[in-house]
Amino acid sequence: MPLGVRGTRREFRFPVWGLLLLALWMLPRALGVEEIPGPDSHEKQGFQIVTFKWHHVQDPYIIALWILVASLAKIVFHLSHKVTSVVPESALLIVLGLILGGIVWAADHIASFTLTPTVFFFYLLPPIVLDAGYFMPNRLFFGNLGTILLYAVIGTVWNAATTGLSLYGVYLSGIMGDLSIGLLDFLLFGSLIAAVDPVAVLAVFEEVHVNDVLFIIVFGESLLNDAVTVVLYNVFDSFVSLGADKVTGVDCVKGIVSFFVVSLGGTLIGIIFAFLLSLVTRFTKHVRIIEPGFVFIISYLSYLTSEMLSLSAILAITFCGICCQKYVKANISEQSATTVRYTMKMLASGAETIIFMFLGISAVDPAIWTWNTAFILLTLVFISVYRAIGVVLQTWLLNKYRMVQLEIIDQVVMSYGGLRGAVAYALVVLLDEKKVKEKNLFVSTTIIVVFFTVIFQGLTIKPLVQWLKVKKSEHREPKLNEKLHGRAFDHILSAIEDISGQIGHNYLRDKWSNFDRKVLSKLLMRRSAQKSRDRILNVFHELNLKDAISYVAEGERRGSLAFIRSPSTDNIVNVDFSTPRPSTVEASVSYLLRENVSTVCLDMQALEQRRKSIRDTEDTVTHHTLQQYLYKPRQEYKHLYSRHELTSNEDEKQDKEIFHRTMRKRLESFKSTKLGINQTKKTAKLYKRERGQKRRNSSIPNGKIPMESPTRDFTFKEKELEFSDPEETNEYEAEEMSGGIEFLANVTQDTATDSTTGIDNPVFSPEEDQSIFTKVPPWLSPEETVVPSQRARVQIPYSPSNFRRLTPIRLSTKSVDSFLLADSPEERPRSFLPESTHM
């Protein structure tokens, strides 16, 4: 066994990983000292097969190594769940950065790598903020927008002013010693240390899993207070440059005006680029492969444009992601949406890892440290105390107008969750040492504040939340009943506000929804995407999906899946579901799903994403059963490689074909079952009629029947159906589309010998015997009758003399699609069919 690798496997990993890191660091240093001959060297050298060019790839190679080290660090941290469940990942990364920074400084005695403001603001911060805005829950964010703005604007100004003035007051007392700091310097430091950092809040609060309202308030405050922070920082920085004697009242008014310009201007830039991105993705149907590129490039351009105009870049990219997510997700393909989602998460996670690790590395630099115990400790005390006071005062004011009150427990978590991070560090590093004499003291204090809030408060916030029993978020999909009631409550509250003449959240949301549906969606979304957003069809699709899962799971539990594997209809109808085994899946299926009116629509893509059952193993087996045995495509799809476009989604074609097949079968079965017509007799009748029609056509000249009265016959015809965007159609797409069912209206001629088409309906035939409808079904009592009104008797022709009240369909342990087998050619009659049938 090699030296230093003794012990268990867990003890084996970290030493080898550390030695590997040290070797990667020392190897370039050792090889980089080799003397490279200059152009003036007269030494003759022969041809070299391999040359070492470290200086040629030094910068990108080091960047790649640091990214690799950060990624490996996350893997090592998550090897032990006990560590990550107690210590936040951000705190672990800072500690790792301190260790790596110590190794680097011990090797060179120079802080070779630090977190610079340029790298942070232009390359690391945008992916994190874009990810937060693109996946922002819009309903929750805009519902609490007033509360978020109050905390972000008033709260940040309160924290900056009170912290700066309090430090200045203590400085005048002489406790801090001899420091060359003025009032404007203290206010400048208070403005940069007062802002809550979005990166730190995301890193800690996502692991705590507090309730959605509390999370969105703290996180929204950390995003939107950027405008206040930038304005205060720029105002006081310019005042320090001018000097306290030259600052006038006009300059103060300009500073207040600049706040509105910076915040509203950054928001407007983000909205404009969001609409531009949505409009571009509307026309990317034939260039699907570059759709994710548009999302990242245009969003990043909004950030750079705002930075170029001295506006709030964080607000710009945040609102760009918020405003474009709905239209972009509807326009781009499924593969592009998946690419955008995972790429954005990867970039945000990687940037967050690098930020915290380099915060630790940057701290290992003796040149930036200036220690003043009184200044550092008082800063920690003031930012904590004034944060709590500001939250309590603002919450007391907000609770007078909020429908859902913020309790004392929520206020404690909000006060304790005011974390500072890399934004404060980057701003303090930007200070000019010639203008701010005590810059190193400000930098040292900021590093201590960041480490204290991220490490200490991050370690203790989870036990605090558990001790206070704060309500946590429920990670589950809302049920259909909850969605329906939520929509009903929204309409009711909107109506109440409209009647009372008040303009509230519900009224504004309703007006915005109408404007979006009538104007924005038509402008920024493709027509096919607008059709797919129909809520009724979405609910119908989800019900069919649950129906399909229950259908296959029931047959699987009975131990017989032969009827699924066999494509023959004869084998399907011979399956007996009269006494199925009770299953637990039926408990999760609603009453509506057990009725005879549902339809099986097997959507494999949605099944993979939305299936939720009791046992994961059963779900897996059901999924593979549906995918392997329940559908056989009509043709083999060609898999072609192309660098410029993606292959068409086969599941989408299969889903649509399955839907049309199923609807055709269910519609025919529903007609035959309802009217008491046997499937075999109906098929035989249609076959005889078609054969007689062919004989008559052969005997008539030109194959045409004399026209008496043209009628339209709506029949089902097999045709190659193209499922594509109606506004964008090409010839080559029509050749690749799979077959389907199309409803066609054909003009036919009625003759004396053949005047009826399709299935005869005895209700509208006066010569038919109506005795079948007067019989009392076995499940009704003679007293359950309903007398129709005189108007009903006049409007309903050839109706039976007595009507029976429709009772609810009885619950059954059968699969919901087993009722389709009612019209099968069986010898014994079904219990729910009439005793006699009529042609």
Swiss-Prot record:
Q: Which domain of life is it from?
A: Eukaryota
* Ranges of the Extracellular topological domain: 33-56, 108-116, 174-186, 243-249, 310-311, 365-372, 432-438
UniProt biased composition (Basic residues): 688-697
UniProt similarity note: Belongs to the monovalent cation:proton antiporter 1 (CPA1) transporter (TC 2.A.36) family.
Q: Name one GO biological process term.
A: sodium ion import across plasma membrane
Principal location listed in the UniProt entry? membrane
* Keywords for this protein: Antiport, Cell membrane, Endosome, Ion transport, Membrane, Phosphoprotein, Signal, Sodium, Sodium transport, Transmembrane, Transmembrane helix, Transport
Gene transcribed to yield this protein: SLC9A3
Q: How does it sit in the membrane?
A: Multi-pass membrane protein
Q: Please verify whether the record's keywords include Ribosomal protein.
A: no
Q: What is this protein called?
A: Sodium/hydrogen exchanger 3
Positions of the UniProt region annotated as Disordered? 688-710
| Stretches in topological domain Cytoplasmic | 80-87, 135-137, 209-210, 285-286, 329-335, 395-407, 473-839
Which Gene3D superfamilies does the UniProt entry name for this protein? 6.10.140.1330
